[in-house]
Amino acid sequence: MKKGLLIISCIAATTLLVGCRGGRGRGSSTSGDTPSNTVTPGTSNSGNTGSKPTGQSSNTSITPEEKGSTTVLIYMCGSDLESGGDYGIEYGGLATSDIQEMVTVIGQPSDVNIVIETGGASQWESTFNISSSKLGRYHIRSNALVKDEEITYASMGLASTLKDFLVWGMTKYPADKTALIFWNHGNGMQGCCFDEKKNDDHLLNSEIQTALSGAFNELGRTDKLEWIGYDCCLMQIQDIAETNSAFANYMIASQESESGYGWDYDTWVDDLYAGKTTEQVLTAIVDGFIQDNGGANLESYEYQGETYAADQTLSWLDLSKANQYMVAWENMANQLKSKITSSNKSSWNTLVDSAKHFAGDDYAQVGIFDAKDFVNKLAANSTFNPGSTYTNAVLSAHSALVKYNVAQKGAGNAFGLSLFYDIEGQAGRDDCYTDDDTNFTNWKYIVDNYGGFSGGWW
């Protein structure tokens, strides 16, 4: 377990603090190579030829392990969180640290597997001898990281790379329940898993959906994943939750920028090994993360003579309620379309801007606002209020969708789910909020037609 209050202030988007999971990273860097042996070398059954330029292995030749009860797939894009970026490896090692946490947990049942794909970092700490020039595939067994295979490097920001890992992982380690974790930076609708070896190429929500759909189709899979998690900043967004609901039962993510150390892996892995329910494991992730950052009652903290808000958040959702929520939101948005005009859109943007926002001073570049706080303010606004029938329906659906949410006192009105709105035209809506990225079509119409443009709201 990580000890002490972590450095949890973060600048998302254009400026990145090493040790923070928000933003795009520091840009590309050249890769170095490290030895390929791990703590416990394993034998690959994948039939990988090592010659495919996409990095994909020959998944048709995988020899599956015996079907287990649970497999957790971790897509670990190390980036500068691992390499330290411009500051060097001594300021990185955060991916390695989380692997170390997992391998120290005792009592792993034989039918529970944690499977990791590594990449995305120009350098890895030497603890596990993870190569930066290959994509590595590992599993945890007997308190050791065991190598399954290394394959030709490909950007972790490609849908094809994610899809290949999903196909390989679900084929090699079949289970009654399968979970998927994205480990890296997150930047809201602008995506996650920024590969510093490939000019910060990253996964948009549309690309994640393409990868999931492709993997499910290739495998003929009809059972949903048990849960999808984002150990990344700023990813608990209603559009992402709704699209993920086609592929998973639950989702866990943060509305705010996460502290650099991210989740407390040993705490929740211990509960996983103990056979706790999905709901208990997800709750343990939330509680462990918040506790590691000083607890829910913390309002602020001091660091190097400066005072910062303690604003960490984490929540998990019941995705079976996501469609109901989207319908309620879209009905509300449809009413709003007749209330917002070119003459009052400045007032409209002021209303949206008054809602709780995330990513600190750079919030306009990310465009993430608390959904419930916005609806509460909308309901109190005489100009734009669509009527209590619509706002109450959204609030009721929100309560059903957000099953567990903890926010530190310094986070303010963070109720567990965010919306996207391009308040100043800086959040990249033309690239990250397309018809392929969201099914909230009425809300997208409002964002596209009444959101701000570069330089202001007019």
Regions found by a protein language model. Give the residues of each.
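C-terminal motif of bacterial Sec signal peptides marking the signal peptidase cleavage site
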Residues: 16-19
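Terminal, contiguous helix-loop blocks that mediate binding/assembly
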Residues: 44-60, 167, 171, 188-189, ...
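Short acidic, glycine-rich surface-loop motifs adjacent to enzyme active sites
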Residues: 176-191
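Positively charged n-region of N-terminal signal peptides that target proteins for export
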Residues: 1-4
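N-terminal extension/subdomain marker
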Residues: 27-174
